[in-house]
């Protein structure tokens, strides 16, 4: 959400820190917070003024009218404060319908003053600007300030000066206080703007001869401005409204939400409740809550929440397990219900999100059965059939009753089923599979005739006169038609999937040319990106600079802005500098409201229509679609969005607009145009902007509006009907009717979905619309029926003549999507069995990386997983690590190190120098480790005794690999071998091959003392013993690892550490190019050549 309430303490702290005014503000930072855990001795140490001044104490928990409720203790000593707090601190209180515990109080100095010194000041944001209210009589009895107070609107980008304040606001203020008040209000307004407040009320503001005192303060800030105000705000806290506790689970989901590009929301209403929801989509989540409350479930509704914006499988798992954990804590005598609902997704892969939920259900199957939980599922969107299949499957395998429905079932029908108001069908009708839409069912390869590109009703627009003649449209700068079959757009952002979706839509609508002319992406140079137009490959240019894109594509008049919330404002402002652009869609959610208002102001000046922010966009069947609107091609075809119908709609929610596509296609001849204006408080274009366009468009015969709690935009529709400006039938339903039934305020998924006054509630708006003559259903459940009855009435009157359906062209399916749907298979070019990086976390041979660290497996354990695909015993891991340590380096003289040093001194980079050293490893250097293992294993396994083996090798004239050392001998042992031998003898369960090799060593050293078992030989034979005897491998597996050269890997990996060390050493010593000295080279030339 956007506007969030902050505590009085936070508001005052920010104000005292950052307000800039000539008025003398008294008692700065003089406040002390008291909670049930407060240590009074410590509090007095921090705030010594508590002992010397008269005090005021009050709860700081977003409670309005505390004075009237007797929740303010005035003019008390410290002991008096303690006595006053005793029956209140930590005790339950009732405020209106809300019950909650009082556990956060504020103590401040008492300010003696007269009633004449109390004033009221309030600043709040609206679409047009910020209203400043002032009343010369403040305090608890201020009454209806809207009616009494002086009011001044400060427009967007305008400044408030002291002269305006005196002239418009301080009309009735005492003359001697006007200067002080004007300076304070001016500073307060600048502070309010700079720190992105949306509401700031001080009542009373006391002005005495000593200065200004801020007694009581209430405030809201725009939480989305955190990235701008972080330095000044610090770690700001947003307390829950009174009557609702702050739960750690809510904080956990809020933290997940903050770290994700997706949206994840959770509000606990009644943790003991029977009905729980897990709904996809900001709009759909409100509709489900409405329906539950309408059907009598308000007291049993446990939570409000939503997930949207394509969360990953892991994020959905984390969200789902949080809800399942909460709902399986307390039993309910009637069992519990979980509603996993959602509208038809535009771009979220339903199967991926459902797999996360399925994982959570499997993890909690025991508690779910114990608590007698029944689950109802309804969803649509990309790959929804697979999602529903896995959901149904988990019900069968776990024994949990799970009822699964798709787009063939009305979105909220499952609520009626869950609450026993409608029967649960045994076999719901199944929708056609994705593939059935995209693959030509007849088998014919010919492209069908072009589909119709105008509704039949549009071609007869002049023949059938409307029932009433509409008043002429007011002259406007903005066009009634935003999109046509020839509309061209630029897409800001590297959104290849959305662009391909637009091109597929264009193709299936039989457009002559693609609707995307170019893309703008500032983070790469100019280039071309490959896309498909039907089965053909085409190139679309990508520009670094917007100016270049505009210059080269003057035919473009639409920009689709996929910039992030941080970049969306600047990129949209830049776009509006180009007169050719008439429509801009802003997809990003979370743009601060103050910045959105600046965009709206500039757009109005330029005559530009903005759709969004926080939207999926809009669609005009047969002509143009914005980004991901309408979902994937299967939904476009199922909802008949490839040709126009007669019904135009406007909604706030992107997901609900897709649901409207589905409802309208099932109950009428289809959609003519649909726009989702976005969920923010100040959408760029309003309901009425689009409703008036539809009124002036001959092809539109009826209008559907899906309104929402918050704002007053829907009342303009009532006014339009009364004034005769709107004459076409309008069907409207405002979602959010459940809000009036909750005891405490709930912020819904959309930033603008919050009623600040009675007229903004969904119930009030639905009533007013009905009285104005709009067709209003009794609930969202009946919306489809009302639309159908209005449509059938228009058909009966002849205003709409349904046209004959023409099949659309067949569009080839993307390979990657066909594979995801399981429609095709192809042999993979590569196979791997050791590592998987595709999920939420890295997996080594089946073990998540978090487990690797939790178990403290170390380098040896990781090698066990990556090299041998299994967990090795601890001593084996330690042995591997010891081998790496002892093989790490053997000085600069050996061939590998020598090569590395020469390369480093020749100025080569790290990788080149390292590889030059590694390339020397072979039979003569390092490779003895592998060869020794094979040679000793063969001898031992053949059953010949050590003496026989030595004699055999001597007779064949072969060296025994792993025996012998240039420097070390039986009298000067190699300490590396000694360390390894001690460890192996102490920890290995058996060492038959090592014992054999040591017997061989006795024979060889009796002939020559330096023919010892060297470090290569020791590691080789000991490693074979480890593989054969640790219990983790079969004999065949152990032999295979020796045969494929796994042991050489130990030397290569270990020695790489030393080679890198030599490289860094040479660079650090700044050694120059190496040239070998002549006196160390013996020049032996052929004699006949030297003559």
Swiss-Prot record:
**Which Gene3D superfamilies does the entry mention?**
3.30.470.110, Citrate Synthase, domain 1, Cytochrome P450-Terp, domain 2, NAD(P)-binding Rossmann-like Domain, Succinyl-CoA synthetase domains
- As given in the record, the signal peptide range reads none
Annotated PROSITE patterns = SUCCINYL_COA_LIG_1 (PS01216), SUCCINYL_COA_LIG_2 (PS00399), SUCCINYL_COA_LIG_3 (PS01217)
Q: Does the keyword DNA-binding apply?
A: no
Instruction: List where Low complexity composition bias occurs.
Output: 442-457
Active site per the UniProt annotation: 750
Q: Which domain of life is it from?
A: Eukaryota
The record's listing under InterPro entries reads: ATP-citrate_synthase, Cit_synth/succinyl-CoA_lig_AS, Citrate-bd, Citrate_synth-like_lrg_a-sub, Citrate_synth-like_sm_a-sub, Citrate_synth_N, Citrate_synthase, Citrate_synthase_sf
Give all N6-acetyllysine modified positions.
530, 536, 544, 938, 958, 968, 1067
Q: Which UniProt keywords apply?
A: Acetylation, ATP-binding, Cytoplasm, Isopeptide bond, Lipid biosynthesis, Lipid metabolism, Magnesium, Metal-binding, Nucleotide-binding, Phosphoprotein, Transferase, Ubl conjugation
BP terms from Gene Ontology: acetyl-CoA biosynthetic process; citrate metabolic process; lipid biosynthetic process; oxaloacetate metabolic process
Residues annotated as carrying Phosphothreonine in the record are 447, 629
EC number, as in UniProt: 2.3.3.8
The ATP-grasp domain is annotated at 4-265
The UniProt annotation places Mg(2+) binding at: 257, 260, 262
Residue ranges for the region (Disordered) are: 442-478
Which amino acids does the record list as binding CoA?
Answer: 769-779
UniProt modification remark? Phosphorylated by PKA and GSK3 in a sequential manner; phosphorylation results in activation of its activity. Phosphorylation on Thr-447 and Ser-451 depends on the phosphorylation state of Ser-455. Phosphorylation on Ser-455 is decreased by prior phosphorylation on the other 2 residues. Phosphorylated at Ser-455 by BCKDK and dephosphorylated by protein phosphatase PPM1K.
Binding residue positions for citrate:
309, 346, 348, 364, 379
**Residues that bind ATP, according to the entry?**
58, 66-67, 109, 111, 118, 216
Q: What is the effect of changing residue 536 to R?
A: Abolished ubiquitination by the BCR(KLHL25)complex, leading to imapired differentiation of inducible regulatory T (iTreg) cells
What is its cofactor? Mg(2+)
Which family is it part of? In the N-terminal section; belongs to the succinate/malate CoA ligase beta subunit family.
| Role this protein plays | Catalyzes the cleavage of citrate into oxaloacetate and acetyl-CoA, the latter serving as common substrate in multiple biochemical reactions in protein, carbohydrate and lipid metabolism.
Q: What is this protein called?
A: ATP-citrate synthase
């Amino acid at each position: 959400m956007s506007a969030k309430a902050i505590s009085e303490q936070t508001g005052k702290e920010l104000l005292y820190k950052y307000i800039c005014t000539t008025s003398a503000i008294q008692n700065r930072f003089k406040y002390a917070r008291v909670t049930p855990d407060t240590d009074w001795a410590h509090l007095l140490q921090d705030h010594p003024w508590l002992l010397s001044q008269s005090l005021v104490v009050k709860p700081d928990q977003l409670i309005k009218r505390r004075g009237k409720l007797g929740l303010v203790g005035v003019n008390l000593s410290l002991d008096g404060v303690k006595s006053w707090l005793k029956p209140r601190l930590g005790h339950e209180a009732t405020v209106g319908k809300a019950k909650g515990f009082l556990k956060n109080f504020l103590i401040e100095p008492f300010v003696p003053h007269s009633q004449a010194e109390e004033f009221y000041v309030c600043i709040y944001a609206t679409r047009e600007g910020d209203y400043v209210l002032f009343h010369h009589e403040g305090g608890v009895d201020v009454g209806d300030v809207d009616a009494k107070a002086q009011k001044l609107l400060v427009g967007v980008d305008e400044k408030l000066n002291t002269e305006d304040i005196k002239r418009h606001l301080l009309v009735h203020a005492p003359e001697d206080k006007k200067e002080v008040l004007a300076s304070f209000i001016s500073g307060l307004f600048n502070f309010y703007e700079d720190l992105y407040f949306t509401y700031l009320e001080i009542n009373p503001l006391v002005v005495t001869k000593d200065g200004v005192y801020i007694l009581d303060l209430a405030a809201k800030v725009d939480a989305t401005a955190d990235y701008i105000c972080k330095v000044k705000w610090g770690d700001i806290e947003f307390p829950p409204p009174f009557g609702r506790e702050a739960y750690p689970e809510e904080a956990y989901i809020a933290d997940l939400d903050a770290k994700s590009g997706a949206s994840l929301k959770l509000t606990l209403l009644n943790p003991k409740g029977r009905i729980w929801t897990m709904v996809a989509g900001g709009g759909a989540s409100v509709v489900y809550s409405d329906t539950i409350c309408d059907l009598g479930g308000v007291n049993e509704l446990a939570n409000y929440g939503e997930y949207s914006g394509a969360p990953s499988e892991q994020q959905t798992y984390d969200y789902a397990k949080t809800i399942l954990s909460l709902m399986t804590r307390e039993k309910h005598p009637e069992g519990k219900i979980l509603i996993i609902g959602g509208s038809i997704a535009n771009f979220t892969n339903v199967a991926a999100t459902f797999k996360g939920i399925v994982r959570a259900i499997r993890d909690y199957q025991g508690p779910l059965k114990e608590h007698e939980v029944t689950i109802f599922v309804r969803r649509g969107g990309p790959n929804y059939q697979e999602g529903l299949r896995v959901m149904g499957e988990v019900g069968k395998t776990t024994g949990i009753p799970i009822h699964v429905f798709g787009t063939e079932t009305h979105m909220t029908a499952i609520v009626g089923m869950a609450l026993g108001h409608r029967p649960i069908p045994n076999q719901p009708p199944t929708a056609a599979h994705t593939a059935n839409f995209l693959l030509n069912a007849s088998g014919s390869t010919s492209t069908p005739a072009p589909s119709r590109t105008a509704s039949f009703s549009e071609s007869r627009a002049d023949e059938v006169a409307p029932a009433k003649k509409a008043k002429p449209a007011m002259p406007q700068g903005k066009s009634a038609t935003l999109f046509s079959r020839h509309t061209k757009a630029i897409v800001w952002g590297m959104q290849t999937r959305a662009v391909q979706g637009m091109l597929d839509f264009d193709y299936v609508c039989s457009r002559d040319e693609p609707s995307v002319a170019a893309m703008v992406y500032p983070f790469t140079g100019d280039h071309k990106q490959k896309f498909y137009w039907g089965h053909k490959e085409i190139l679309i240019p990508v520009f670094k600079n917007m100016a270049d894109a505009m210059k080269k594509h003057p035919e473009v008049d639409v920009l689709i802005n996929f910039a992030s919330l941080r970049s969306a404002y600047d990129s949209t402002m830049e776009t509006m500098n180009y007169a050719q652009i008439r429509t801009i869609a802003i997809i990003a959610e979370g743009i601060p409201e103050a910045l959105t208002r600046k965009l709206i102001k500039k757009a109005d000046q330029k005559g530009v229509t903005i759709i969004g922010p926080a939207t999926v966009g809009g669609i005009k069947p047969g002509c143009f679609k914005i980004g991901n609107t309408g979902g994937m091609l299967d939904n476009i075809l199922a909802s008949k969005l490839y040709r126009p119908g007669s019904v135009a709609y406007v909604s706030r929610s992107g997901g609900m607009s897709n649901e409207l596509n589905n409802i309208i296609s099932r109950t009428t001849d289809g959609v003519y145009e649909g726009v989702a204006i976005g969920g923010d408080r100040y959408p760029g274009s309003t309901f009425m902007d689009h409703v008036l366009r539809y009124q002036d468009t001959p092809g539109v015969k009826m209008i559907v509006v899906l309104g929402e709690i918050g704002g007053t935009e829907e009342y303009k529709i009532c006014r339009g009907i009364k004034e005769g400006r709107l004459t076409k039938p309008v069907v409207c339903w405002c979602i959010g009717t459940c809000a009036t039934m909750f005891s405490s305020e709930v912020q819904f998924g959309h930033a603008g979905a919050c009623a600040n006054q009675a007229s903004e509630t969904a119930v009030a708006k639905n009533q007013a619309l009905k009285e104005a003559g709009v067709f209003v259903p009794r609930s969202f459940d009946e919306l489809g029926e009302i639309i159908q009855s209005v449509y059938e009435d228009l058909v009966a009157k002849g205003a709409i003549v349904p046209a004959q359906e023409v099949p659309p062209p067949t569009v080839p399916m993307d390979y990657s999507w066909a594979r995801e749907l399981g429609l095709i298979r192809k042999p993979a070019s590569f196979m791997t069995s050791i590592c998987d990086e595709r999920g939420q976390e890295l997996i080594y041979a089946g073990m998540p990386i978090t487990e690797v660290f939790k178990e403290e497996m170390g380098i040896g354990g990781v090698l066990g997983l990556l090299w041998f695909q299994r967990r090795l015993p601890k001593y084996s891991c330690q042995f591997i690590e010891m081998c790496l340590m002892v093989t790490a380096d053997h000085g600069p003289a050996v061939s590998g190190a020598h090569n590395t040093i020469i390369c480093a001194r020749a100025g080569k980079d790290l990788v080149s120098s390292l590889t030059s050293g590694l390339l020397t490893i072979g039979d003569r250097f390092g490779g003895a480790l592998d060869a020794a293992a094979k040679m000793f294993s063969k001898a031992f396994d053949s059953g010949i005794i050590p003496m026989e083996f030595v004699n055999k090798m001597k007779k064949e004239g072969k060296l025994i690999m792993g025996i012998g050392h240039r420097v070390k001998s039986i009298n000067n042992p190699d300490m590396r071998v000694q360390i390894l031998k001690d460890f192996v003898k102490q920890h290995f369960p058996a060492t038959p091959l090592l014992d054999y090799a040591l017997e061989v060593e006795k024979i060889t050293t009796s002939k020559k003392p330096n023919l010892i078992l060297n470090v290569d030989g020791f590691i080789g034979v000991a490693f074979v013993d480890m593989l054969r005897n640790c219990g983790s491998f079969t004999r065949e597996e152990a032999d295979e690892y020796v045969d494929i050269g796994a042991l050489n890997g130990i030397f290569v990996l270990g020695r790489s550490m030393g080679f890198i060390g030599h490289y860094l050493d040479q660079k650090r010593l700044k050694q120059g190019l190496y040239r070998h000295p002549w006196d160390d080279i013996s020049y032996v030339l052929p004699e006949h050549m030297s003559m």
